[in-house]
Every structure is written in C-alpha cells, then in structure tokens.
C-alpha cells in the first residue's frame, strides 16, 4: 500500500527560506521520541473520545474555542475504536526565524523536504504561522477499516501541543488508495475517462494525510488525472465552470462539483454531485428534480453506472440548506 511511509520514508532535511524540515531519520533521538510520544498521546485521546483531554493538550488560541474540534473527535472516535495505534512518521518543522508579514500578521510557512538522491519532494504549506518550532505526527489506527490521524503540533514552553488535527480514512469500500490509483490507470486504458477521473480523486483523498501536505507522488497522480480527464472535465467542475447536462425533457442541470463518497460503506463508492438550483422547493418537487438530475447524468455518461454503487445529489439554492437524495444505480432510470 502506498502510505505516508512510502511517500516520505527516506526524506532528509530540506530548507525553504527561513523554515527547515527534518524527518525522523535525520533528527535526534530526543526530538523523535518527543514528537512520537506527543502524537501517540493525542491519538489515544481521540480514540477514547476524550475531547477534554485533547483540549488540555492544545495550543491556547484553539483550546479556548474547541467546539468544532470536539465535534471532529466525536465523529472520529467510533471509527478508530479498538484499532492499534502506530506512529507512521514524524517531522520537525522549524520556523523559529520566520518573520511576520508586511501587515504584522503571522506569515505563511513552507517547509520543503527533498527525497534522498532524487528530485522528488514533499511540501508542508501552512498558512498564518507564528514563529516557532512545529512538528507533524502521522499516526495510523490499524484495524478492519484503518484510519490515519495526523497532528500539527507546536512547542509551547518546552511542551508539544496540538495546533491542528487531520483525521482521514485509509480505505473506501474496502480498498486503499493504491488500489484506486491502479484501477484508475486500468480505466484510462479502457477509455473509461469519467470513471478514471473520479477514481483518481478517491486515490488522492486516501493517500494524502492532510491538505497542507503535497508531494511529488501526489503531483504525479494529479498529472495523470488531468491528462486522462474527458474534455468536459479538463478545467474541473466549479460554480464558475459547471458541468451542464440536458435531461430527456430538455431541462438543463448545472452541476457545480463532482466527487466521491463512502459514507454508506457499500461494496463500491458513490458519486456525489452538487446541483445549482434557484429554489429548493417542497420535498416532493425537490426529490423529483434530484432523481431527474441523476438520470440525466447517467444518460449522458453511462459508463458511470459500472464503477459506483449509486449517486448522491445535493441541490443547493442560495441561502437555503442543501436538499440531498441518494439512490443506488439500479434505482435510477
């Protein structure tokens, strides 16, 4: 499996301006043990659903407003219950000499780590970072459905405290990121460009520990995805550049995003699509519109029926809550 271990196992110290990145193979035993101990302790608090305990280990500016993180802990704890916690990787990120921006506010920091004897690299790009010493700990919660618990940590008065929490599943529908990457390549060869584009998306979500990390391996994945994208997806799918699909009755459906989802834990992942609408409407009208949008999407791109369990449609109207509908492929006509 292509995990953070493969992405970064042979990283050595790299320099980007005033910031330095030291990986566990290059750091001192003292630093390595301290970072690993902090990461494990934080992961244990998450596993125990001990939000108060994790709050006590959090930097002051986040500890004082902990509600959002508490919710994430509560959602993650059941996913990692009973799992074995294993320290996968730790990094020492030193921004002690980082200067504030021209406006006096904390500057963005970029920590560049180069792979030994190659041009490959991994990047940590962290916005609005006060000068100081930071670390990043990746903890695997190994079980039937493994998760990766990653923590940005900052040294405060000699103690390592949490400055960011990034929980992510390592599998979807029973498969890991490398499986989806390999499957996407097979789909490209079979001219299934739509399925491949979405499988590449799932692969990246499973392989990347956190959005603030980029690597040459992930860049390679994205380049493959972009090269294989069907023309309608060459510029992505956004609110400014929606995917427009016509239904059998001539109605147009404007999709502002196209992605994947594993929340139902079926044997295949689901497609998710966000639909731009003017009004949500009453539930009966909204559901029919959503199911008609599903039908139009699959009629336009029938290959999507093969690679996925079903479709989620989220109809979004300005100032209103999204209206969601999910159907299995066999229920969409």
Feature roles, as predicted:
Residues 1-3:
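N-terminal secretory signal peptides that target proteins for export/translocation
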Residues 42-54, 184, 190-194:
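Short helix-adjacent coil turns
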Residues 18-48, 164-179:
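Short, low-complexity N-terminal intrinsically disordered segments enriched in polar/charged residues
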Residues 169-252:
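Acidic, serine/threonine- and glycine-rich low-complexity intrinsically disordered segments
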Residues 106, 110, 129-174, 252-281, ...:
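Short beta-strand edge/turn micro-motifs at domain boundaries
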Residues 5-15:
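Bacterial N-terminal signal peptides
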Residues 22-30, 36-40, 52-120, 204-234, ...:
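Short solvent-exposed beta->alpha transition segments
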